[in-house]
Amino acid sequence: MRGCLQLARWLSAAPTRPAASHWPGLCAAPRFFSHSAILRASARTARAAASKPPSDLESRIAAIPIERYRNFCIVAHVDHGKSTLSDRLLELTGTIEPGTNKQVLDKLDVERERGITVKAQTCTMIYNHNGEDYLLHLVDTPGHVDFRAEVSRSYASCGGALLLVDASQGVQAQTVANFYLAFAQGLELIPVINKVDLPSAEPERALEQMKQSFELDTENAVMVSAKSGLNVEKLLPTVVDKIPAPIGDCKKPLRMLLVDSWYDSYKGVICLVRVFDGEIRAGDQLVSFATGIKYYVGEVGIMYPNETPQTVIRAGQVGYIFFNPGMKRSKEAKIGDTYTKVGSEKAVEPLPGFEEPKAMVFVAAYPVDADHFEHLEDSINQLMLNDRSITVQKESSEALGAGFRLGFLGTLHCSVFEDRLRQEHGASIIITPPSVPVKVLWKDGREEIVTSPAKFPDEDELRSKVAEIKEPYVLATLTFPDEYLGKVIELCESNRGVQQSLEYFTSTQVILKYELPMAQLVDDFFGKLKGSTKGYASLDYEESAWQTSNIVKLQLLVNKAPVDAVARIVHYSQIERLGRKWVTKFKEHVDRQLFEVVIQAAVGRKVIARETVKPYRKDVLAKLHASDVSRRRKLLEKQKEGRKRLRAVGNVVIEHKAFQAFLSK
């Protein structure tokens, strides 16, 4: 009561009509804003943010002409020290504090866990050389063949590259592959020998290999130790002198290439861009050449090494932008797309973009809990924003429910994606073993690429309608010490390989080229190769051709009913080994039933291997007198008939966790 009286006195003392300047929402009629009004308000907010006084960093960047820009990347084989060298360069230019840094540009959890670079990461640095500031843009690229699409995209924003070689290991397979990729893009290459302070280092041998393999001028080569920082200070003057400045004009209409994108839970889709002409500020209205959709820029900035807002990004620079309002769908951010300002569409020629890599390894992914399907779909879409080389199709399985058919560039690519799903999105998934696509040539002239066992022709169609089936082959390049030559040749031959060439590029190092089926390559070929050579071999591969092959569908049957989640497309020579492995492993995870459970591996009507799970046996003779033989026989016959009837009508109950355990490695 006392509270009500106090409230009444407060209301009577308050003004009867609030001042319009203080309470616009109470005195005026409700206002409804149109979408265009919201966009204009967002643009005004962005322009207000852009009009703030520039920071010291911005002032230094603004004073640097495009002639003093240098865009470069570091390319090398896996584990030759790219990320560690990047750390030293960032410390040398004052971008990060020295001493406590370890792979600053490896930002993903999976990269730090595995010690490999998965995503190409960028960073802007300012370097003072001979009294003048230079704007350096560094890209740390992956070394593994599965992430070559990342490397080739990085080259589009660079004018040169540091070709890094480990002094103790020398030139290896992916060094060769990355060199030819950079050479084809016309990049200026600077040879760098790393890890020269190791006891096993042979820098002169590594230099000689680079000279013989690539015909590079090694007089300008720099000998460094990225770990200790030895001679790293000699690298940047070489970069400034040897790598050309980017070509661009700030006065021309904006022409900007989308190089990469990722998702931020607060800002939405963030785009990494390379500006070729013109300049871009917050508040500008842009249009995409690929989709025709228009956006207002919410913020622009550079990676220094993290997102650092700026007033403007000019021609020749690489930076990030995000839109306000953001993109409605993540698929709007198309890698390789060209953007310009609204009104300049006719004056600007779109850039050629990137060639999309083809997925060559396919797996099926299902949520462990069927209720988490939508969460898994959202997680996959967000990761695809950051990795456009993945292909996705929805599919369903009777055993595992709704899921996805995912396509990857290789087995490591698949494994890293699975780790990122679990770590970054908390998604629990079941992944089927990797398989490769096959090409079916029908007798009526049609060609069909089959990526899922469910779409593979059945036995009757194979006989009557299919002309031939082809599988993809790759040209694999293997480098290793010559003492392991016999073991490596034996491994390649046992995996249906055909030798193409054998050469020595030093007295002890061999380059061996084999044509191998892609299906054998994804079946842990690299692990077997490392085992045969005590870890000294390196592997690189490129697509070769489709070749006619004896391909069949291997199925797992439980009481003659096929289990669709386990079916695989394999070569005929593999069916016996794989079939026996399947039935033995699956038997371990199937619970005993009241009737006999028969597990078979079959190709069409032909059974390859079989295991039986014995039923529970009820003791029907427990209460019977030992001497009553006829009664004993009658009870056993009745039990036998009951089992037959149960086997005929009973369904085998296989727990979801049984599939999860079977499909896990």
Curated annotation (Swiss-Prot):
Signal peptide: none annotated. One of its GO terms (cellular component) is mitochondrial matrix. GTP binds at residues 76-83, 140-144, 194-197. Residues 67-247 form the tr-type G domain. One of its GO terms (biological process) is positive regulation of translation. SUPFAM superfamilies: EF-G C-terminal domain-like, P-loop containing nucleoside triphosphate hydrolases, Translation proteins. InterPro entries: EF-4, EFG_III/V, EFG_V-like, G_TR_CS, LepA_C_sf, LepA_CTD, LepA_IV, P-loop_NTPase. It is a peripheral membrane protein. It catalyses: GTP + H2O = GDP + phosphate + H(+). It is found in: Mitochondrion inner membrane. It comes from the Eukaryota. Residues 1-40 form a transit peptide. GO terms for molecular function: GTP binding; GTPase activity; mitochondrial ribosome binding. Its EC number is 3.6.5.-. Disulfide bonds: none annotated. Pfam families: EFG_C, GTP_EFTU, LepA_C. Keywords: GTP-binding, Hydrolase, Membrane, Mitochondrion, Mitochondrion inner membrane, Nucleotide-binding, Protein biosynthesis, Transit peptide. Belongs to the TRAFAC class translation factor GTPase superfamily. Classic translation factor GTPase family. LepA subfamily. Promotes mitochondrial protein synthesis. May act as a fidelity factor of the translation reaction, by catalyzing a one-codon backward translocation of tRNAs on improperly translocated ribosomes. Binds to mitochondrial ribosomes in a GTP-dependent manner. PANTHER family: TRANSLATION FACTOR GUF1, MITOCHONDRIAL, TRANSLATION FACTOR GUF1-RELATED. This is Translation factor guf1, mitochondrial.
